[in-house]
Amino acid sequence: MPMFSRFRYIVFTVALLSGPVCAGPRADLSAFTRGLKTLQGHFSQEIIDTQGRVKERSNGTVALSLPNLLRWECDAPYKQLVVADGKRVWLFDPDLNQASVRLQGNEERNSPLIALIDPIQLDLKYDVSEEVAMRDGLRWLSLRPRVGIEASFQSASFGFAQTQLARMELVDNLGQRTVIVFSGWQRNPVFAVDTFRFTPGKNVDVIGDR
């Protein structure tokens, strides 16, 4: 899978959430993100094709900081790194010694993870619903892009366990499903100044416009 496709679900713009509180997973979402400025945790991810076969597994760490900074680092089965520095998105594959770079744009603004960061845009861009029944022991909030919104997914769902975001599931426009399980969240940690910076080495092959 190309590097850009590999990470298109996880690169997003970050902003503060202060949405209305109501019963159910929407309340869980509000509780999870209230007062959020920085966030760090672990993830494991599976990409599943339309036949139900697991195409890819990975795990690693994710860090974000307001207003629009992201670091998504895969540790296994191979190392890869995504850094959104506020202006550009860098994707680095150390095995290939190759980095791809592009401007942050619509893909980030229309990411399903906007649910974590901007409730006004959430309701403007998506039809939001709460699943009535619990699934896998989690309470679920579901999103579908409204007509006219350019998005790389058909639907997205967030699973909460006691106000903690535990899982995200996405179905892309080809019917492929991505399942991301989160754990070990740390709220508002202090990051090193270079956490959200990427500087390619002299011998790194850079593809894209710097």
From Swiss-Prot:
Coiled coil: none annotated. It is found in: Periplasm. One of its GO terms (cellular component) is outer membrane-bounded periplasmic space. It comes from the Bacteria. Its main location: periplasm. GO terms for biological process: lipoprotein localization to outer membrane; lipoprotein transport. Keywords: Chaperone, Periplasm, Protein transport, Signal, Transport. It holds the Pfam family LolA. SUPFAM superfamilies: Prokaryotic lipoproteins and lipoprotein localization factors. Residues 1-23 form the signal peptide. Participates in the translocation of lipoproteins from the inner membrane to the outer membrane. Only forms a complex with a lipoprotein if the residue after the N-terminal Cys is not an aspartate (The Asp acts as a targeting signal to indicate that the lipoprotein should stay in the inner membrane). PANTHER family: OUTER-MEMBRANE LIPOPROTEIN CARRIER PROTEIN (PTHR35869:SF1). Monomer. Belongs to the LolA family. This is Outer-membrane lipoprotein carrier protein.
